[in-house]
Amino acid sequence: MGVEGILEKGFVTTTADKLINYTRTGSLWPMTFGLACCAVEMMHAGAARYDLDRFGVVFRPSPRQSDLMIVAGTLCNKMAPALRKVYDQMAEPRWVISMGSCANGGGYYHYSYSVVRGCDRIVPVDVYVPGCPPTAEALLYGIIQLQNKIKRTNTIAR
Protein backbone atom coordinates (compact mmCIF):
# COMPACT_ATOMS: atom_id res chain seq x y z
CA MET A 1 0.00 0.00 0.00
CA GLY A 2 2.93 2.33 0.40
CA VAL A 3 3.36 2.49 4.13
CA GLU A 4 5.34 5.61 4.99
CA GLY A 5 6.41 4.57 8.45
CA ILE A 6 5.63 2.31 11.38
CA LEU A 7 5.71 3.97 14.76
CA GLU A 8 6.60 2.27 18.04
CA LYS A 9 3.03 2.34 19.43
CA GLY A 10 1.65 0.15 16.64
CA PHE A 11 0.51 2.95 14.34
CA VAL A 12 1.07 2.95 10.61
CA THR A 13 1.40 6.20 8.70
CA THR A 14 0.69 6.71 5.01
CA THR A 15 -0.60 9.42 2.70
CA ALA A 16 -4.25 9.95 1.86
CA ASP A 17 -3.49 9.42 -1.85
CA LYS A 18 -2.03 5.98 -1.26
CA LEU A 19 -4.86 4.95 1.03
CA ILE A 20 -7.58 6.07 -1.39
CA ASN A 21 -5.88 4.44 -4.38
CA TYR A 22 -5.36 1.21 -2.43
CA THR A 23 -9.06 0.98 -1.66
CA ARG A 24 -10.01 1.80 -5.26
CA THR A 25 -7.90 -1.03 -6.64
CA GLY A 26 -9.70 -3.57 -4.47
CA SER A 27 -13.18 -2.59 -5.60
CA LEU A 28 -13.33 -2.19 -9.38
CA TRP A 29 -16.89 -2.55 -10.63
CA PRO A 30 -16.91 -3.02 -14.42
CA MET A 31 -19.73 -2.16 -16.76
CA THR A 32 -19.70 -4.87 -19.39
CA PHE A 33 -19.90 -3.68 -22.96
CA GLY A 34 -19.66 -6.99 -24.79
CA LEU A 35 -20.01 -6.51 -28.53
CA ALA A 36 -18.66 -9.72 -30.10
CA CYS A 37 -16.74 -12.92 -29.38
CA CYS A 38 -14.46 -11.22 -26.84
CA ALA A 39 -17.47 -10.94 -24.55
CA VAL A 40 -17.49 -14.74 -24.23
CA GLU A 41 -13.93 -14.63 -22.88
CA MET A 42 -14.94 -11.81 -20.55
CA MET A 43 -17.74 -14.00 -19.18
CA HIS A 44 -15.23 -16.84 -18.89
CA ALA A 45 -13.01 -14.61 -16.74
CA GLY A 46 -15.94 -13.87 -14.44
CA ALA A 47 -16.86 -17.54 -14.01
CA ALA A 48 -15.64 -19.98 -11.38
CA ARG A 49 -12.29 -20.93 -12.92
CA TYR A 50 -10.77 -17.43 -12.88
CA ASP A 51 -13.19 -15.78 -10.42
CA LEU A 52 -12.66 -12.05 -10.78
CA ASP A 53 -14.50 -11.57 -7.48
CA ARG A 54 -11.33 -12.45 -5.59
CA PHE A 55 -9.73 -9.31 -7.00
CA GLY A 56 -12.71 -7.18 -5.99
CA VAL A 57 -14.05 -7.05 -9.56
CA VAL A 58 -17.84 -7.36 -9.47
CA PHE A 59 -19.80 -6.89 -12.71
CA ARG A 60 -22.52 -4.26 -12.40
CA PRO A 61 -25.64 -3.95 -14.59
CA SER A 62 -25.84 -0.15 -14.53
CA PRO A 63 -23.32 2.48 -15.63
CA ARG A 64 -24.12 4.58 -12.56
CA GLN A 65 -22.92 1.75 -10.32
CA SER A 66 -19.68 1.10 -12.18
CA ASP A 67 -16.29 2.76 -12.46
CA LEU A 68 -14.69 0.54 -15.13
CA MET A 69 -15.87 -0.18 -18.66
CA ILE A 70 -14.58 -3.22 -20.52
CA VAL A 71 -15.14 -2.74 -24.26
CA ALA A 72 -14.96 -6.25 -25.72
CA GLY A 73 -15.43 -6.70 -29.43
CA THR A 74 -16.11 -4.88 -32.68
CA LEU A 75 -17.41 -1.34 -32.27
CA CYS A 76 -19.53 -0.22 -35.21
CA ASN A 77 -20.42 3.36 -36.10
CA LYS A 78 -24.02 3.00 -34.94
CA MET A 79 -22.93 1.71 -31.52
CA ALA A 80 -20.34 4.47 -30.93
CA PRO A 81 -22.81 7.12 -29.63
CA ALA A 82 -24.29 4.56 -27.22
CA LEU A 83 -20.80 3.72 -25.95
CA ARG A 84 -20.07 7.39 -25.32
CA LYS A 85 -23.43 7.88 -23.59
CA VAL A 86 -22.81 4.94 -21.24
CA TYR A 87 -19.29 6.23 -20.54
CA ASP A 88 -20.65 9.68 -19.67
CA GLN A 89 -23.15 8.14 -17.24
CA MET A 90 -20.42 6.37 -15.26
CA ALA A 91 -19.27 7.84 -11.96
CA GLU A 92 -15.90 9.55 -11.60
CA PRO A 93 -13.17 8.34 -11.45
CA ARG A 94 -13.73 5.99 -14.36
CA TRP A 95 -11.46 3.74 -16.35
CA VAL A 96 -11.70 1.87 -19.67
CA ILE A 97 -10.16 -1.43 -20.75
CA SER A 98 -10.15 -2.13 -24.49
CA MET A 99 -10.29 -5.90 -24.94
CA GLY A 100 -9.40 -7.59 -28.21
CA SER A 101 -8.06 -6.61 -31.60
CA CYS A 102 -11.41 -5.27 -32.81
CA ALA A 103 -11.83 -2.90 -29.87
CA ASN A 104 -8.16 -1.89 -30.01
CA GLY A 105 -7.95 -1.03 -33.70
CA GLY A 106 -10.75 -2.53 -35.75
CA GLY A 107 -9.16 -5.97 -35.97
CA TYR A 108 -10.29 -8.24 -38.76
CA TYR A 109 -12.91 -5.68 -39.83
CA HIS A 110 -10.48 -2.73 -39.87
CA TYR A 111 -11.19 -1.74 -43.48
CA SER A 112 -14.97 -2.04 -43.23
CA TYR A 113 -16.95 1.16 -43.72
CA SER A 114 -19.10 0.53 -40.66
CA VAL A 115 -16.41 -0.20 -38.05
CA VAL A 116 -14.75 2.28 -35.70
CA ARG A 117 -11.00 1.70 -35.90
CA GLY A 118 -10.43 1.54 -32.18
CA CYS A 119 -12.66 2.51 -29.28
CA ASP A 120 -10.03 5.06 -28.21
CA ARG A 121 -11.53 7.35 -30.87
CA ILE A 122 -14.73 7.48 -28.79
CA VAL A 123 -13.61 7.12 -25.15
CA PRO A 124 -10.19 7.44 -23.48
CA VAL A 125 -8.65 4.00 -22.95
CA ASP A 126 -6.42 3.17 -19.98
CA VAL A 127 -5.39 -0.43 -20.74
CA TYR A 128 -5.29 -2.34 -24.04
CA VAL A 129 -5.64 -6.14 -23.92
CA PRO A 130 -4.41 -7.67 -27.22
CA GLY A 131 -5.62 -10.87 -28.85
CA CYS A 132 -8.30 -12.26 -31.11
CA PRO A 133 -10.01 -13.13 -28.87
CA PRO A 134 -7.81 -12.52 -25.84
CA THR A 135 -7.84 -15.25 -23.24
CA ALA A 136 -9.32 -14.84 -19.79
CA GLU A 137 -5.78 -14.75 -18.42
CA ALA A 138 -5.00 -11.77 -20.67
CA LEU A 139 -8.03 -9.89 -19.32
CA LEU A 140 -6.95 -10.77 -15.79
CA TYR A 141 -3.48 -9.39 -16.54
CA GLY A 142 -5.05 -6.22 -17.97
CA ILE A 143 -7.09 -5.72 -14.79
CA ILE A 144 -3.96 -6.17 -12.68
CA GLN A 145 -2.16 -3.60 -14.85
CA LEU A 146 -5.06 -1.19 -14.36
CA GLN A 147 -4.85 -1.71 -10.61
CA ASN A 148 -1.14 -0.87 -10.74
CA LYS A 149 -1.93 2.26 -12.78
CA ILE A 150 -4.56 3.36 -10.25
CA LYS A 151 -2.07 2.97 -7.41
CA ARG A 152 0.31 5.41 -9.16
CA THR A 153 -2.23 8.20 -9.76
CA ASN A 154 -2.68 11.32 -7.65
CA THR A 155 -6.21 11.59 -6.33
CA ILE A 156 -5.99 14.76 -4.28
CA ALA A 157 -5.31 17.92 -6.30
CA ARG A 158 -2.36 19.97 -5.09
UniProtKB/Swiss-Prot annotation:
GO molecular function (one): NADH dehydrogenase (ubiquinone) activity
Pfam families: Oxidored_q6
Cofactor: [4Fe-4S] cluster
Cofactor note: Binds 1 [4Fe-4S] cluster.
Binding site for [4Fe-4S] cluster: 37-38, 102, 132
Primary location recorded for the protein, binned into one broad class: membrane
Protein location: Cell inner membrane
A GO-annotated cellular component: respiratory chain complex I
Record GO biological process: aerobic respiration; electron transport coupled proton transport
EC numbers: 7.1.1.-
Quaternary data: NDH-1 is composed of 14 different subunits. Subunits NuoB, C, D, E, F, and G constitute the peripheral sector of the complex.
Keywords: 4Fe-4S, Cell inner membrane, Cell membrane, Iron, Iron-sulfur, Membrane, Metal-binding, NAD, Quinone, Translocase, Transport, Ubiquinone
Its biological purpose: NDH-1 shuttles electrons from NADH, via FMN and iron-sulfur (Fe-S) centers, to quinones in the respiratory chain. Couples the redox reaction to proton translocation (for every two electrons transferred, four hydrogen ions are translocated across the cytoplasmic membrane), and thus conserves the redox energy in a proton gradient.
Family named by the database record: Belongs to the complex I 20 kDa subunit family.
Reactions catalysed according to its record: a quinone + NADH + 5 H(+)(in) = a quinol + NAD(+) + 4 H(+)(out)
Membrane topology (UniProt): Peripheral membrane protein
Protein's name in the database: NADH-quinone oxidoreductase subunit B 1
EC class (word): translocase
